[in-house]
Design a protein with these regions (language model features):
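N-terminal lobe/hinge region of extracytoplasmic solute-binding protein
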Residues: 32-82, 113, 183, 494
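Surface-exposed binding/hinge segments that line
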Residues: 90, 124-171, 175-196
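Structural transition elements
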Residues: 188, 321-359, 373-380
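Ligand/substrate-recognition segments at binding pockets and active sites
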Residues: 197-199, 237-238, 256, 346, ...
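Ligand-site clamp/hinge motif
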Residues: 211-263, 395
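Periplasmic-binding protein-like
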Residues: 289, 293-334, 380-381, 486-494
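Extracytoplasmic/peripheral linker and loop segments enriched in polar/acidic and small residues
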Residues: 300, 344-346, 397-408, 436-506, ...
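Long beta-strand-rich cores associated with HINT superfamily self-processing modules
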Residues: 504-526
């Protein structure tokens, strides 16, 4: 459907229609969430809905503030000894899980171990750890094979997969298996009995939570749950969601369609802006285990034809204030962004790309593209790629589904004939791709890597050198080399940056600018 036709249809939906939900009750934040909460394990998956859920339910030892400084969170503090080879962490007093049990050092060690098996930064940390020891219930020590000054950054990061602390018995679950208990120590308790996958989810304030006695800053500081309840309603249809916000039936919406933002801004009862720091990046991910995209020349052919502006206009409209081209594997406008090796994305040459497809020996193998229709940005990018692949001569099987199903299917390492996949789109926020440590998508460590499983020993060696570097100038040089190598093998294709608007009632106060949506610090005025 064209934008003009869609907006004409939307005008009808803003007329009186049956109410979707009752007006927000006092003490309850009613949220329209654009994507299904399909998994409750933030280590097993990195989908945004699970990440948003996890920041309410779980807590971190350390966290990152608005100035990108790592600060204590669950930790009271830490000491560094033995020439940087031993870190001793002390937990704050009074920490407890939602089942009433105290948070202990054993829980922290088990949680670090499980997280480090899946996360890219965590895997590097794990390779440097010589051992982890319980000192007592509130203190534990991490012993390193050699100094690793980035250890606090790994434990406190907000990006990709976070090191959330779980009870020891839960963290003992294989990192390749989803957990069956969902008990954290964060400011909100998840109400499992009220969870209806695909429809709704709810949380209640955890009265046993002891926040830090300091102002919130980014995701650091005092995580004060000011609302008694948070309720998500999953509304994938943007016209329905917009009409509900216009009528004041919900308090917050996290995925406003760009075309609808001007109309919502005309409503004197709404605020429309993005609280997400640095915006969001679109990406095209390949399955590199199976044909046809185990052939790097075919990946390069697609990159040669890509025009980021086509993708960003599809997502964010024609106003360049909403989006930007970013031909970097690291977030543009940050220290590690560069132009190294990115000439292939400046080609934008469909005829050259067609010739490359032919020269690469493509034989008409079926390409299964999975597309999440309940995420407006992912849906928009998916249509652009579908058209591009067809123009390049690929035999495309376009599978439209929801993000939760996509997240389940992308786990499969089977060929397409057995339910596997070939390509999909995903989105990551600015802090998720700041540098080689946190950019999960650039990892090229094969079977132990993120979905798509690219393998590139050269890139991995360069990444290891980046971690070992001690000077900023050396790290910048190595980051540029990593990017140049990534453009040769293409673990993914960067598709640009956009600023996703959110909308909330003017009665809602305390919305924090952060790397990810957060629900603590938010209150509602009468």
């Amino acid at each position: 459907m064209r934008r003009r036709e869609f907006l004409a249809g939307l005008a009808a939906t803003t007329l009186p229609m049956p109410a979707i939900a009752s007006r927000s009750a006092a003490g309850t934040l009613k949220v329209i969430h654009g994507a299904n909460l399909s998994s409750l394990d933030p280590i097993w998956t990195t989908v945004p809905a699970t990440k948003d859920y996890a920041f309410m339910v779980y807590d971190q030892l350390l966290s990152i503030d608005a100035s990108y400084v790592i600060r204590p969170q669950m930790a009271e503090g830490w000491t560094v000894e033995n020439n940087g080879r031993a870190y001793t962490f002390t937990l704050r007093e009074g920490l407890k899980f939602h089942d009433g049990e105290p948070v202990r050092s054993q829980d922290c060690i088990a949680s670090i171990r499980r997280w480090a098996a899946r996360d890219g930064f965590g895997q590097v940390l794990a390779s440097r750890i010589d051992g982890m020891d319980v000192v007592d219930d509130r203190r534990f020590r991490i012993r390193l094979k050699k100094a690793f000054p980035l250890l606090p950054a790994a434990l406190g990061k907000s990006s990709s997969s976070q090191c959330f602390i779980m009870p020891e018995r839960v963290a003992a679950t294989s990192p390749m298996t989803q957990i069956s208990e969902h008990i954290g120590s964060g400011p909100f308790r998840f109400l499992r009995d009220e969870w209806v996958p695909g429809a709704s989810a709810a949380w209640a304030r955890f009265d046993g939570y002891v926040p830090r006695q300091e102002p919130v800053s980014g995701i650091a500081g005092g995580r004060v749950a000011k609302m008694a309840r948070v309720e998500w309603t999953i509304i994938g249809d943007v016209a329905t969601a917009s009409a509900a916000m216009m009528r004041g039936e919900y308090d917050y919406w996290d995925q406003v369609l760009f075309d609808l933002a001007p109309m919502l801004r005309q409503n004197r009862n709404l605020v429309v802006r993005s609280p997400i720091v640095g915006g969001t990046y679109g990406m095209l991910r390949f399955n590199q285990l199976h044909p046809p995209f185990n052939n790097p020349e075919l990946r390069r052919a697609i990159a040669t034809a890509v025009d980021q502006a086509d993708y960003m206009r599809a997502v964010a409209g024609d106003d360049p204030a909403n989006w930007a081209v970013c031909n970097s594997f690291f977030a543009c406008g940050t220290p590690y962004a560069s132009e190294a090796g990115n000439g292939i994305l400046r080609e934008k040459n469909i005829d050259k790309a067609k010739a490359m497809v032919k020269a690469a020996g493509y034989k008409g193998e079926r390409v299964v593209q999975i597309a999440a229709t309940d995420s407006a940005p992912v849906d928009a990018m998916s249509h652009v790629t579908h058209d591009l692949l067809q123009r390049l001569g690929f035999n495309v099987d376009y599978v439209a589904t929801d993000f939760g199903t996509l997240a389940q299917r992308r786990v499969s390492r089977e060929p397409v004939e057995k339910g596997g996949w070939s390509v999909f789109h995903t989105i990551w926020n600015n802090p998720d791709i700041l540098d080689p440590a946190v950019n999960q998508m650039i990892r090229s460590n094969g079977a132990t890597g993120w979905f798509g499983w690219p393998a590139d020993d050269t890139l991995e060696t360069l990444r290891g050198e980046w971690f070992d570097a001690t000077e900023d100038a050396e790290r910048k040089r190595l980051a540029a080399e990593i990017q140049a190598q990534a453009y040769k093998t293409l673990p993914y294709i960067p598709l640009g940056n956009y600023t996703q608007p959110h909308a909330w009632s003017k009665k809602v106060v305390g919305v924090v600018s952060a790397p990810t949506p957060i629900y603590w610090n938010i209150a509602k005025e009468a």
